Amino acid sequence: KSIQSALEKAKPTHLLHLGALQTPDCRDYPIRGLDVNVLGTAYLFKACLEMELPLERFVFASSSAVNGPRALYGEEGVRPEDPLQPFNLYGYWKIAGEGMAQAYHQESTVPTVSLRLATTYGPGRDRGFTAALTSALKAVASGERFEIPYRGKENYHFSHDVGAGFARAVIDPFIGYGVYNLPGQTCTVDEFLALIHEEAEDMGLDGFEIPYAE
C-alpha cells in the first residue's frame, strides 16, 4: 500500500528504482535482504502494472555483482552478454531484479533498462563492501588510518558520473528492454592508492595511513 500511495501521489512518467540493501547487509541479514531487494522490487513492478501508470521509462539499478570474479573474463572486460556467475546473495537478487524488469517490459511494453554499476567512489558512497576507497579518501582528508580490506582490479565510477549515467538512462531515446554496463575506468587497487598518495602529496596532506588489512 505504501508503494501504491507514493505512486498515486507522484504520478511518475519516468521511474528510477534505486532501492536496495547493499552487499554486507544482504550477507548479515539475508531474510531482510530478500524482503527488500526481491520482494520490494516485485511489489513495485506489480503496482506499476496494476495502476496502469503513464510510464514512458523504467530504469532498474543493477550491479556488476551479477557477474563472477574478474578472472573469469577476458582482457576486454565484462560484457552485458557474458554469463552470469554471482558469488553472493546480492548478485543473485540483482539477477532476479533484471528478470522482473524484462518481464515487466514484456507485459507493459514500457521501455525498460537495467543499468549495471561496478565500484562507485566519491560523495554519497558511504556504505557497502566496495566503499573502502571512499573511506580511504576520507582518511586522507582527516589525517587518519584506514585499512583497505581487499586487493585486485575493479571498474570504478565517480559518484557524480553515476548520477549522470542514470539520468541518461532515464531520458535518452530508447525502446524495448536492454541491459547495459555503466562505463567506468578499470585499474588495480594499488594503482588507485598510488593516485591517492600522489594527489595528497600535491595538496600538502600528511599524517594518514592506508595499509592493506592483514
What are the roles of these predicted feature ranges?
Residues 95, 108, 121-134, 144, ...:
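Glycine/proline-rich active-site loop of Rossmann-fold NAD(P)-dependent oxidoreductases
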Residues 17, 42-89:
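Conserved Rossmann-fold NAD(P)-dependent oxidoreductase catalytic core, especially the SDR/UDP-sugar
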Residues 2-36:
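NAD(P)H-binding glycine-rich loop region in Rossmannoid oxidoreductase-like domains
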